A protein has these predicted regions:
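Radical SAM/AdoMet-radical enzyme domain recognition
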Residues: 47-63, 72-173
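Canonical Radical SAM [4Fe-4S] cluster-binding loop centered on the CxxxCxxC motif
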Residues: 10-44
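Short, motif-level signal for alpha-helix interfacial/capping segments enriched in acidic residues
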Residues: 1-4, 45-49
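Short, histidine-centered active-site or binding-site loop motifs used for metal coordination
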Residues: 32-35, 64-66, 131
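N-terminal [4Fe-4S]-dependent radical SAM core
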Residues: 1-17, 55-56
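Pocket-edge positions in alpha/beta enzyme catalytic cores
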Residues: 37-41, 68, 135
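Short acidic donor-binding/metal-coordinating loop in glycosyltransferase active sites
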Residues: 20, 66-67
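Short, charge-rich binding segments
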Residues: 6-10, 30, 85, 107-108
Length: 173
């Protein structure tokens, strides 16, 4: 894998999506992640990708993704600390289902200027049909607990909604 990264010709990379793991604690109906490798991205691979994206010296976005990226929080922290040490002009983003957010994680993300997007596909009755826990029950309660952690810590977040035939007719706005 390292040799593949080294052989990529570097152009100005505007956005680097780091899929920190294929693992997820949910089993969403439409998700492709269940078909992917469930291994964790190593910190070495993550840092090599960041160096490649930073090579142009221009501002770029690093988005932590997955599966559920907070399942590999150690790699996320390593990247965040490395970006700070190197003073890379990176904008940091996390796309999460929110269920693993704790006060400690939320404060770390806030202090390190990691923007947070939480996935929610509509009102609970609709979201629970699309976003489910591994036991088959709806995940809305877990997602809302994560959003509450952010609210309690005065941390703003964005919401990401996957529009499907199940929710398109009931979304407002």
């Amino acid at each position: 894998m390292q040799s593949e990264i080294n052989n990529v010709q570097t152009h100005k990379i505007k956005m680097l999506v780091l899929s920190l793991t294929g693992k997820c604690n949910f089993a969403c109906r439409y998700c492709y992640a269940v078909e992917h490798d469930r291994s964790m991205m190593t910190e070495n691979i993550a840092l090599a990708a960041v160096r490649m994206a930073a090579a142009s010296g221009e501002k770029f976005v690093i988005q932590f993704s997955g599966g559920e990226p907070l399942l590999n929080f150690a790699a996320l922290q390593t990247v965040v600390e490395y970006v700070k040490e190197q003073k890379y002009p990176a904008i940091l983003q996390l796309q999460t289902n929110g269920s693993l957010l704790t006060d400690k994680i939320a404060q770390y993300l806030y202090q390190n200027k990691v923007a947070i997007g939480v996935s929610l596909d509509g009102r609970p009755t609709v979201n629970n049909k699309l976003r489910m826990k591994r036991n088959g029950y709806g995940a809305t309660g877990d997602i809302l607990k994560g959003i509450e952690v952010l609210r309690r810590n005065n941390i703003a977040c964005g919401l990401t909604c996957v529009v499907t035939s199940t929710n398109v007719g009931v979304l407002e706005g």
